[in-house]
């Protein structure tokens, strides 16, 4: 909600500055879909074919809500045997859409929206299966050296720039390495300062994800206006947005998310 509100305010600011031309009716229609948290049909050019024009990352939350609804409604989706049948199908769909679109970055626009559905279907229900194994007492552990080696291999994947290697790397990340890292991390035990740090990072992570795009757009508009278009380097912009998104996420968690959750819990 907060991310979409910030995105809507940015659109209003651009209209008032004369940088965008949007009729009040168009804004109301898009706002309705944003408030209802439904994908907005690609009715207007200014939405850039985005299902959630005010806050692009909201597409994944939409699919997560759909997946949670399916999980709550159909008991068979919680059975390991059903998941072991469903996940290969989801993996095939994810592979198909990734190869078709030429990228793993799917879901944030309508051209790749079905790929986003496949992406969330595999990742979400892989998480359900991992949790089921964990709940039943299965534990996976790696020696520290092997764990660091695994993280190093994952990080080095960003060096692949050729399309063929990058595609194979993205698919291996989606289908194997990321679920493996989640399974291993779920069995890790931490205490003291590392545990507190993990808690803080966990509290901030979702806010950073949902707020970084509106902040990126705002900073892009501001720096272009002050210094000229594309005069700020990508690294500088990344650092600025990272710092601001972290601060915004901390404020949102403390002043918005926690009080709202407490109120809803008491009333519901």
PLM regions: where:
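Residue-level recognition of pore/gate-forming positions within transmembrane alpha-helices
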Residues: 4, 90-95, 128, 217
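Membrane-interface helix-loop-helix regions
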Residues: 3-65, 96-97, 172-186
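A short, conserved beta-to-alpha structural element at the edge of catalytic cores
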Residues: 24-34, 87-103, 116, 124
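Alpha-helical transmembrane segments in multi-pass integral membrane proteins
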Residues: 42-48, 73-82, 102-255, 259-268
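Alpha-helical transmembrane segments of multi-pass membrane proteins
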Residues: 2-3, 75
């Amino acid at each position: 909600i907060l991310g979409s509100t910030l995105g809507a305010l940015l659109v209003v600011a651009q209209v008032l500055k004369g940088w965008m031309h949007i009729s009040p009716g168009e804004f109301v229609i898009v706002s309705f879909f944003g408030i209802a948290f439904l994908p907005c049909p690609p009715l207007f050019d200014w939405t850039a074919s985005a299902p959630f024009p005010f806050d692009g990352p909201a597409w994944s939350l939409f699919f997560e809500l759909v997946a949670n609804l399916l999980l709550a409604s159909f008991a068979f989706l919680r059975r390991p045997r059903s998941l072991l049948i469903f996940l290969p199908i989801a993996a095939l769909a994810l592979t198909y859409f990734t190869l078709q679109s030429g990228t793993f970055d799917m879901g944030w626009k309508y051209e790749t929206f079905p790929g986003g559905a496949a992406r969330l279907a595999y990742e979400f229900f892989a998480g359900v299966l991992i949790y089921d194994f964990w709940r039943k007492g299965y534990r996976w552990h790696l020696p520290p050296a092997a764990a660091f080696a695994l993280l190093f291999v994952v990080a080095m994947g960003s060096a692949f720039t050729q399309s063929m290697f990058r595609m194979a790397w993205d698919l291996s990340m989606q289908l194997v390495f990321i679920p493996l890292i989640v399974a291993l991390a779920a069995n890790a035990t931490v205490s003291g300062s590392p545990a507190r740090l993990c808690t803080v990072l966990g509290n901030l992570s979702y806010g950073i994800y949902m707020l970084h795009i509106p902040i990126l757009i705002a900073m892009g508009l501001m720096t272009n206006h002050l210094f000229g278009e594309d005069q700020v380097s990508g690294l500088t912009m990344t650092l600025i947005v990272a710092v601001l998104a972290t601060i915004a996420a901390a404020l949102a968690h403390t002043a918005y998310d926690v009080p709202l959750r407490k109120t809803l819990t008491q009333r519901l």
